[in-house]
């Protein structure tokens, strides 16, 4: 993955011009739910992954209502870009205001087929970026920030080695692992088991 994304990065950086800096918050944790929740749901996702989009469309709302909004669990979103467009989309989302991040990625998932298959994906992503509060100047600054690109790529490689993550979406919940498209019942069983292990059932 490193070589492929690195070659793409060089081409894309040349396209957006001289290097500038992304906002300092671009690499901070992105999470939903209370910081002190007893259970952490780690989601590893690629923004061009159709099964990831299905999770956000069909299942996340149920998890949010049952566990995140009740302070029983916290969902931490980890970028795991599987292709060049997913990497660019991840950078774009992280450069927006942190409080709008999950709204931003929900739009990216809902409109995934449109922007990922567009003849000009940069223009398609820029349109979404502007809806999320980014200027074109900030959009270009983020895409030309080699440090941000390297950091996202390195994080994905690190978790791939540490947790043997090879596909998306992958979820780690306590000692349980969920891969691919799964129904809410499967997440409920894993979260309830983790709550029981934490003495919070």
What are these regions (language model features)?
Residues 2-82, 153-162, 193-201:
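Extracytoplasmic thiol/disulfide redox context detector
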Residues 3-5, 22, 46, 60, ...:
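C-terminal cap of thioredoxin/glutaredoxin-like
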Residues 27-28, 42, 71, 83, ...:
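Generic signal for short, ordered secondary-structure residues
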Residues 29, 77-80, 113, 140, ...:
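Conserved short-loop catalytic and cofactor-binding motifs
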Residues 32-35, 43, 95, 116, ...:
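Short N-terminal micro-motifs specific to bacterial/archaeal maturation
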Residues 38-39, 99, 166:
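Structural motif
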Residues 45-47, 53-130:
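Structural alpha/beta surface segment adjacent to cysteine/selenocysteine redox centers
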């Amino acid at each position: 993955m490193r070589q492929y994304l690195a070659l793409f990065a060089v081409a894309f950086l040349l396209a957006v011009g001289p290097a500038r800096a992304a906002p300092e918050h671009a690499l901070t944790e992105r999470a939903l739910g209370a910081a002190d929740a007893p259970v952490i749901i780690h989601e590893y996702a690629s923004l061009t992954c159709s099964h990831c989009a299905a999770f956000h469309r069909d299942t996340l709302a149920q998890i949010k209502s049952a566990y995140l909004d009740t302070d029983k669990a916290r969902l931490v979103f980890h970028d795991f870009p599987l292709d060049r467009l997913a990497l660019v989309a991840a950078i774009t989302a992280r450069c927006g205001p942190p409080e709008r991040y999950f709204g931003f990625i929900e739009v990216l998932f809902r409109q995934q087929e449109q922007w990922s298959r567009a003849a000009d994906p940069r223009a398609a992503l820029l349109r979404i970026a502007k809806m999320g509060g980014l200027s074109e100047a900030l959009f270009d600054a983020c895409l030309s920030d080699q440090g941000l690109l390297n950091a996202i790529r390195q994080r994905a490689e690190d978790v791939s080695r540490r947790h043997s993550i090879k596909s998306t979406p992958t979820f780690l919940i306590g000692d349980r692992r969920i891969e691919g498209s799964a129904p809410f019942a499967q997440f409920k069983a894993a979260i309830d088991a983790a709550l029981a292990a934490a003495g919070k059932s």
